Amino acid sequence: MDSRERVLASINHEKPDRIPCDLWAEPGVWERLKKDLGAESEEAVRKALEVDIRYISPRYPPDTLTNGVKQNMWGERWEKTSTIFGVEWEHTRGVLFDAQSVSDLEAFPWPTCDQVDYSHVAEDVKRCEGYAVFYGNADFFERPGLVRGLENIFIDVMINQDMVDYLQERFVSFFIEDFHRSESTP
């Protein structure tokens, strides 16, 4: 049973030959795993640990860096912080944290799929043959929480539902188009 078959068996409530394995890690953890396993790359770590899932995504525009704060196309922001594993990027207030109305949300320069490079997606899928493939990161709740602030999203659900609806529409529409474009790459 290969990794793809193993994950599909589990999803279908069938018994796999072993429990499927996945791995997400921060940069400091990847470095430690590479060192401890004598691995040259993250992919070598995945193979050594028999990780069954591979992640692919299109290439998004590069993050910007202003005054030590990194921001992506969605307005998610990170600041460097020291941890016991080294310096990591930690989420900080997103660009829409102080928005008070739908018009404030509308004023943000929302990204479009035209800014995204899909040219390598088909090749990445081929490279992952035999593995379960997870595409993209269409997180319709977490991402709005990162650009708006999770606490603000919870408050908005109670008293600013129009803002929640607007954010959900923006993200869902983007990711539906994103999936369609990734499917249609040669």
Q: Which residue ranges define each predicted feature?
A:
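Catalytic cores of TIM-barrel enzymes
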Residues: 1-186
